[in-house]
Amino acid sequence: MDSNTVSSFQVDCFLWHVRKRFADQELGDAPFLDRLRRDQKSLRGRGSTLGLDIETATRAGKQIVERILKEESDEALKMTIASVPASRYLTDMTLEEMSRDWFMLMPKQKVAGSLCIRMDQAIMDKNIMLKANFSVIFDRLETLILLRAFTEEGAIVGEISPLPSLPGHTDEDVKNAIGVLIGGLEWNDNTVRVSETLQRFAWRSSNEDGRPPLPPKQKRKMARTIESEV
């Protein structure tokens, strides 16, 4: 196993521990708590994949961070902060909408790279809105936290989420996953629209009303793809 992979995991575990202590003091805002919850799942998945104990890794990560801080000057810290581009966290959903459990009568699921696409194929003839929480850097989607499909009544009928065990995805990965989700939902004569935030950063080929134009052949192909891979 590559030593950099192990040390990276150890540092991530310790930094998560620090953030958790911060959150336990009720100092974190909604985006902070959201990322904390997602990163916990990611660390569990990575730990399982690597065969490493999280508690042991956290202690090792603490030693690495302490050594770095001991060698770091205030001036070097200022230069590092100034040179790192800042990302923005954008939210369509409330914390309640993100954490709410939902159930599918006719579940369909597809794994596309490091993203998991889920939808309820029992939903028909509904107006559906796609909402997402994600970070943006250089005016492009950086990391998808969670995307969900909501009916006008507020029911959740679809979802795109990163797989904890496979971190890392591009804005194109997210766009392709959105296309698959839309194709599956529109197959049952649902009308799907995308939030303004998603239109701007993750789905630029939308119509003015926020409804992505998908040809019938593409919709059928996407729906068949989902069914064949479940």
From Swiss-Prot:
Top-level taxon: Viruses
Coiled-coil segments: none
Extent of motif Nuclear localization signal: 34-38
Main location: host cell
A single Gene Ontology CC term: host cell nucleus
Record PTM: Upon interferon induction, ISGylated via host HERC5; this results in the impairment of NS1 interaction with RNA targets due to its inability to form homodimers and to interact with host EIF2AK2/PKR.
Pfam families per record: Flu_NS1
GO terms of biological process kind: symbiont-mediated suppression of host cytoplasmic pattern recognition receptor signaling pathway via inhibition of RIG-I activity; symbiont-mediated suppression of host gene expression; symbiont-mediated suppression of host mRNA processing; symbiont-mediated suppression of host PKR/eIFalpha signaling; symbiont-mediated suppression of host type I interferon-mediated signaling pathway
Chain spans, region Disordered: 205-230
Region RNA-binding and homodimerization: start-end pairs: 1-73
Residue ranges, annotated region (CPSF4-binding): 180-215
MF-aspect GO terms: protein serine/threonine kinase inhibitor activity; RNA binding
Localisation per UniProt entry: Host nucleus; Host cytoplasm
Region entry PABPN1-binding, spans: 223-230
InterPro entries linked: NS1, NS1A, NS1A_effect_dom-like_sf, uS15_NS1_RNA-bd_sf
Domain remark text: The dsRNA-binding region is required for suppression of RNA silencing.
Extra remark: SC35 was derived from A/Seal/Massachussetts/1/80 (H7N7) by serial passages in chicken embryo cells, thereby acquiring a multibasic cleavage site in its hemagglutinin (HA) and becoming 100% lethal for chickens. SC35 was then passaged 11 times in mouse lung, yielding the mouse-adapted variant SC35M.
Function: Inhibits post-transcriptional processing of cellular pre-mRNA, by binding and inhibiting two cellular proteins that are required for the 3'-end processing of cellular pre-mRNAs: the 30 kDa cleavage and polyadenylation specificity factor/CPSF4 and the poly(A)-binding protein 2/PABPN1. In turn, unprocessed 3' end pre-mRNAs accumulate in the host nucleus and are no longer exported to the cytoplasm. Cellular protein synthesis is thereby shut off very early after virus infection.
Similarity remark: Belongs to the influenza A viruses NS1 family.
Binding partners and assembly: Homodimer. Interacts with host TRIM25 (via coiled coil); this interaction specifically inhibits TRIM25 multimerization and TRIM25-mediated RIGI CARD ubiquitination. Interacts with human EIF2AK2/PKR, CPSF4, IVNS1ABP and PABPN1.
UniProt-recorded name of the protein: Non-structural protein 1
Species per Swiss-Prot/TrEMBL record: Influenza A virus (strain A/Seal/Massachusetts/1/1980 H7N7)
Species lineage: Viruses, Riboviria, Orthornavirae, Negarnaviricota, Polyploviricotina
